[in-house]
């Protein structure tokens, strides 16, 4: 059930979705499943070994009732998709609280904000919004162990600007009312909370200024949060980074801190002290550093991302710390051993190691050998205290930056993802718990992951795929080679080695649409190769802003987007982190600024028209300034003048704008909360998000041959929408669009009556000028009725399905079938061809 919220942005989003002509069109998820994504929050009900709640950073909340064999999303139609924390009441296990907004703030990256706190009293079946929407990033939800009405929230606040909403909040009435009980200042939030299980009035909080500061530190309350005092005895004086707190359940006077000490290091190769473990044996009144092992490399310079610490509920000297790797100590934090790399997976992958970058560890209090670990590769389960793991990689939550397609049958989708490398998968992939994931990795790093962005097949030789690591590391992989290890014998680095180059995290790269041997790469200059990357030359002067001028908004001062006209070779447009937009009409010989009157914000997309060489599209994002206004522009005179296309778009950051290759009036926009369509060249917009989960859409592309829109989401993988009702509108009162032929494999499913998993289904689009019930009838070539059923049509475009079974629940034989829709006296029909593969 969708919670009723009244924030203006969410109200505008829902209003467009529910009024859209296309609200009945169903998106089809196609994966991938097996690569996972960043799991930042885990909760298990007490005494229940089958139920697990997993919060994915930007991929909603998921639940299993069978210890990870199958999963379902619980939180996919709310105003927030980013999960900061999830907590289950110990006294009432059906009560689940969610704090939204990622607790992993990033410079130049995506740590999406949330809209406050949500609560379910039925195990996640329905949700109620409890407010605190202005906190943006909630790092912890802490529930009283016996009183379900009492809860505490640690709020980091707005990431990019001063925020009075930071601090600790308390409710005494189940979330109806909130009181801020700890506030440091507008730049210092709270990143962790812990309580004494034997005295729930005793609380600990770690205050943190991203990335470091002196106002933060450890605070303690002995009166359920009414008053707080800072604890300093034996702790470093600062600057202090992130930290986590763990109270030993068996001996609550023993408290641990795992912190990022940002004080200058005495070692020349280290800018600061880094990871340290502190222990108190008097409930936090005094502390001593206990680690004798050097922990600097546990997270190196990335302490703002990690520091989780957990204590065994039965042994106060057994603890775990998380960073790039995960470690265990059996001697109270003096020495640490890395957890094991023996991995089994629900879905098989080529990876062999435990994924890097660990964010959450839960120890089962009933069985401390049972661990649940969340990292950048998903969720891992251990029954031997971390010596071996089962990777529960059966949740479709890939965080995609980029998507492209080819023209094979079925066409393939190429994608670059955060943390989980470059991928390729078929557009007819079926997502269910019985079907192996057909996606495969273009490459993997040695830790079964890697950040990847633009991923493109070589147009001249399908064996080769171009892909990127961050910051300009362009590679080419021979997919028929002996290894998919990036940097291995089958991959080749194409990174330019010219002096003075600076690259943005997501480096723009493309293959020229006019010459497949010509590649372009965007740094602080535009780089070009005419020999597939063997040699490069700069074809522009410095185009970016001064590097490091503003670390948040302009981290490198390089190009973020670069594109060439599909109509005229050598017309190039590039955009930078700081909002500069450049044009060359002579393949880089000369460049001019064309950004007069445009916002000085991160250029999120540059698109050149398929229909008019002088028409350009731009989108900008104010994400890094906490500005969610939509910035979309068009120029019809090669950038001399610009006109806003924001029109009725809701307040959502825009990540991409594309023009339909067949019709210049059809435009598509992907935002931080969905997809929008314009039929009138941007004068007005309608939503395509009604059947899409709340998810950021980072990229989209039109597959023209199959007339489908493919989107890459940052948290829910790739999705496909039929464009036939959009590209070919009809004036008929009832119209059934042609159905694509379907090929069925004969085994093994035919031998398992009633099991439809893994089976293709027929999908077809129907447009109706009024809402109401329709009768669908499938007849064979001989005219006999094969199947008949009722469907409720919305006014506008609808997606209907048929499971390819007869009235007697048997599979239909190969043949040509007529499919008819009838509403009242209106009838419309088309044909469907079913084939058998003969395998």
State what each model feature region is:
Residues 2-730:
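Beta-propeller blade termini and top-face loops
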Residues 30, 718, 764-766, 783, ...:
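Terminal processing/anchoring signals of secreted or surface-associated proteins
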Residues 475-477, 771-781:
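Beta-strand-rich binding/interaction modules
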Residues 619, 744-774:
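Glycine-centered coil/turn sites that cap beta-strands in beta-rich domains
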Residues 681, 779-785, 817:
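Short, glycine-anchored, charge-dense loop/turn motifs used at functional sites
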Residues 726-757, 838:
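Short, compositionally biased P/S/T/A/G/V-rich stretches that sit at domain boundaries
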Residues 782-812:
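Glycine-centered tight-turn motifs at strand-turn-strand junctions
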Residues 818-839:
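C-terminal tail/sorting-segment detector
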